[in-house]
Structures are given as C-alpha cells and as structure tokens.
C-alpha cells in the first residue's frame, strides 16, 4: 500500500466519550433553554449525554453520518428534486448555457 490510512487520524475529538462538536451543540441548546425558560432544563444534559454515548458506542462517526444524511436528503433541494423527487450528487456545478444565434 502506497499511502496508508491511519484510522486514529480520522477519529473526532472526544469530550466525556462524545464527539466535541455534537456535545457543544447539544449542551449549548440545553443551556439556552435553561436560560430562556427554566433552570430545570439543565437536568436534560445527563440524559442527552447518555443518549449520545449510546449512539457512539458502535461507531464514532455516527453524528457525521447523521449530519450527511440530513444535509443530502433534507437540506439539499436542487432543481431536479421538484420534478423527479430525487437528488443528484455530482462534483460539478452545471450552469445554463446561452444559446448562440447563428448568423446567416
């Protein structure tokens, strides 16, 4: 193998056994709910942490896969989706071409 892939380099940064980015989003949301409505919302943090740790137990990239699913299925609404009810993923962006008028 010419260019080996070291699996340790692909692991996300973990805090309390959960990837740092989903943990920050979840704890920030719970903190905002606790500030806006009631301090009792802070009791949801251990429950959310436990749920995230259970999800991560099998695959440490689970939250990345969930984000990709949401981004590709629900957030990516292109022109083909309205007509074909499907989504196309391509590395190229196609622009409409102008028609050239032929001179007689």
From Swiss-Prot:
The chain crosses the membrane at residues 30-50. It is found in: Cell membrane. It comes from the Bacteria. Induction: Cotranscribed with ptxABCDE. Activated by the two-component regulatory system BvgS/BvgA. The keyword Membrane applies. It is a single-pass membrane protein. Keywords: Cell membrane, Membrane, Transmembrane, Transmembrane helix, Transport. Component of the type IV secretion system ptl required for secretion of assembled pertussis toxin (PTX) through the outer membrane. This is Type IV secretion system protein PtlB. It comes from Bordetella pertussis (strain Tohama I / ATCC BAA-589 / NCTC 13251).
């Amino acid at each position: 193998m010419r260019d080996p892939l070291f699996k340790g380099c692909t692991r996300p940064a973990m805090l309390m056994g959960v990837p740092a980015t989903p943990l920050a989003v979840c704890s920030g949301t719970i903190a905002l709910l606790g500030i806006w409505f009631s301090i009792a919302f802070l009791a949801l943090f251990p429950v959310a942490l436990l749920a995230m740790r259970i999800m991560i137990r099998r695959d440490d990239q689970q939250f990345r896969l969930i984000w990709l699913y949401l981004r590709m299925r629900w957030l990516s609404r292109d022109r083909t989706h309205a007509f074909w009810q499907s989504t196309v993923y391509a590395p190229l962006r196609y622009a409409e071409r102008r028609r050239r008028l032929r001179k007689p």
